[in-house]
Every structure is written in C-alpha cells, then in structure tokens.
C-alpha cells in the first residue's frame, strides 16, 4: 500500500478521524479520501495549527488506532 494512500482502510477509519477532529467537514473528508498529506493540511487549516503540530497529532492518532497509510 502506498504511504499516502489508505485505500480500503480509510473507509473503516473515517469515523474515527471525525471523532478526533470534529471541525473537519464532510467536504474535507471527501478531499482527504485516505491521503495522509491532505489530512495534515486540513487539520492545519481547520485548527490553525502549524504543520509540525498537525503532523504530531496525526502520528499520535495513527499510534493509538494502529493505523497505517
């Protein structure tokens, strides 16, 4: 599986992403569609985080959920 593409796993984890980052809209989720870089970017945009802070949140989320892109 490509590092930036979650493929089928994305459908399983979409709800967990929305739980973690409730400010993400359904349109955001469509844009993200399993692409890690898009998730980091949308977290930056919606929460006003710097890239490193958004990246850290995603890494923490991946670890907690045993999610691999």
UniProtKB/Swiss-Prot annotation:
Task: State the SUPFAM superfamilies in the record.
Answer: Hypothetical protein YjbJ
Give the matching InterPro entries. Answer: CsbD, UPF0337_stress_rsp, YjbJ, YjbJ_sf
Q: Listed GO cellular component terms?
A: cell pole; cytosol
Identify the Gene3D superfamilies for this entry. YjbJ (1.10.1470.10)
User: What NCBIfam families does the annotation carry?
Assistant: PRK10428.1 (NF007748)
Family of this protein: Belongs to the UPF0337 (CsbD) family.
Q: What is this protein called?
A: UPF0337 protein YjbJ
Q: Which organism is it from?
A: Escherichia coli (strain K12)
State the encoding gene: yjbJ
């Amino acid at each position: 599986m490509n590092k930036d593409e979650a493929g089928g796993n994305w459908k399983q984890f979409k709800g967990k992403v929305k739980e973690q980052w409730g400010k993400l809209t359904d349109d955001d989720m469509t844009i993200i569609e399993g692409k890690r870089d898009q998730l980091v970017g949308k977290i930056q945009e919606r929460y006003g985080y710097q890239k490193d802070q958004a990246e850290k949140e995603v890494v923490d989320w991946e670890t907690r959920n045993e999610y691999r892109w």
